[in-house]
Amino acid sequence: MSLRIYNTLSRALEEFSPLEPGHVRMYVCGMTVYDLCHLGHARSMIAFDVVQRWLRASGLAVTYVRNITDIDDKIIKRAVENGETIRSLTDRMIDALHQDADALGIERPTHEPRATAYVPQMLDMIGTLQGKGLAYQAGNGDVNYAVRKFPGYGKLSGKSLDELNAGERVAVQDGKHDPLDFVLWKSAKPEEPADVKWRSPFGEGRPGWHIECSAMGCALLGESFDIHGGGADLQFPHHENEIAQSEGATGKPFARLWMHNGFINVDNEKMSKSLGNFFTIRDVLKEYDAETVRFFVVRSHYRSPLNYSNVHLDDARAALKRLYTALSLVAPAPVEVDWAEGYAARFKAAMDEDFGTPEAVAVLFDLAGEVNRSKSPAAAGLLKALGGHLGLLQADPQDFLKAGAGLDEAAIQAQIAARATAKAAKNFAEADRIRNDLLAQGIVLKDSASGTTWEAAQ
């Protein structure tokens, strides 16, 4: 196949072919469910939703795993603050995650494992690492990974052990052999709730964050699989540590190809909960429709930083309306996409070059221009079909164009009827007043031989 993907591990674009012919196995790091998802999470979920959609469009079967971290220091802290159990908090946040993802048109992954369901697999991997001399139990009861015992550490991030400033990056804890060593199993603390403690050969405790993804990835996709993805902030240390754990345990390459999506920035800083500069998906959806938010994300390349502002979202909304306006001119005909021809070939070439959504979106606008000129049902059908591979343009055009108007449908139709009555009575001043009043409320009237229709102003 002709698909090329940027591999963070090799720092190069690589021709992609799955390890198992015709079947792609992909793991993407998901949410830590202690709070509502913010727009940065949406960016990652949308990016890899587009990836899996295009892999399927390319004729490949896809097993897509996106995990849920449902045990973590932040989760414990929030549950204690709220006076609720870990399970109550995480169940509630997972429900909210699903509602937000569904609203944004993000397809469900094949598997969505909760970390707490895979503790036995984590303990097995920790035992294997300890048996190979790659892990040790410290005096405080924690089991740590001995980073300097794994020769390949740093190959994903491009950092050598000598270059890493452990004092800045890793909290030095009692019992570590080296400041860079990281925890695989955290021993239980007396003050911690009972529902965050598991029995183990190492004593009561809970898994570290990094071992969770290694164990779930191997359990669901095998010891070696095709693609591992996540946000750029996970490249180091999380993904670096996953490689050390998984390859240390199995002796095999973990993921063949590593993909990382860029940040969403606010005032040139990464949007994050820790910085307090984040907007939840729900906050944004109070102001903008879900497809506009998705389009805002998709029209930038997944590896590029994306700057959040109302101006950029307003522009995304106006641009998306131009595409829907073209689709409103003629009913799209069902089409069988010929990927070797014209617009479809250009769209495919864009997507086959590291999921080049900006170029693919440019093809959609060129095709919309063709629809505007030709009023061709086939061209409109192709526009809708190509947009669907990005999770776009599947709504009813009239419904989309009317969305966001200040009045409800019945009130607008009453005004249109009153204007028609005024025009019939040759009271053109009153007809113009009604048109202008509606325009002031963001509603544009369009007269034609078949009557008057309306849409929200751009």
UniProtKB/Swiss-Prot annotation:
Cofactor annotation comment: Binds 1 zinc ion per subunit.
Keyword Ligase: yes
Catalytic reaction list: tRNA(Cys) + L-cysteine + ATP = L-cysteinyl-tRNA(Cys) + AMP + diphosphate
Gene Ontology biological process terms from the UniProt entry: cysteinyl-tRNA aminoacylation
Annotated ATP binding sites: 273
Subunit structure: Monomer.
Name under which the protein is recorded: Cysteine--tRNA ligase
